[in-house]
C-alpha cells in the first residue's frame, strides 16, 4: 500500500488515514506560525541571552557566596520573620549573668518577662532592697545588651516565706513575722 491510495473499499477513511491527515494539518499550522514542523520549535532558534554577569570564580576577597557565620544567619532569619522581640526577651532571661554581671546574677534570678516588665527574685530582702536602689543602672545595662524598649520596668521581689501549713485542716496562726528575708 502506498500513501497515495484512497480510503478503504467501503468508502470511509481508515484510522491510519485519519492520523496522517491530522498530522499534516498540525504540520501546516506549525509552518504557518513559523515553527519547524518536525520538532515544534521556532524555525530559526535565537541564542539564549544570559541575564546578569557572566559566571566568575571567587577571588581572594570576601564574596556573597562564601559561607556565612551561623550567628549572623540566625539573626537575619529572626529579623526577617519578625522574631526580634522574642529573641531579645530570651536573651535577657538566658544570658542573665552576661547582661547584669556575675555579682548581681549570684544573688538575683529573673523569673519572667511580660509586657516589658521583668520580674526578678532576689535571694534576700537586703538584696531586693539593693536591687531596687540600682533599678536605673540595671535597666541601662539591659538596654545596652538587648536594645531599648525590651524591658521597661523591673519588679523586684525578695524570697518567698515558707508555708507553715501542715495538712488539710488549718487554723490561722500568727503569720511568718519578720523571721525570714
From Swiss-Prot:
Pfam families: DciA
Compositional bias per record (Polar residues), positions renumbered to this chain: 1-11
Coiled coil: none
Residue segments, region Disordered: 1-70, 161-181
Transmembrane segments: none
Biased composition (Basic and acidic residues): 18-39
InterPro entries attached to this UniProt entry: DciA-like, UPF0232_actinobac
Low complexity biased stretches: 40-50
Tree of life domain: Bacteria
Record family assignment: Belongs to the UPF0232 family.
The protein, known as: UPF0232 protein MAP_0004
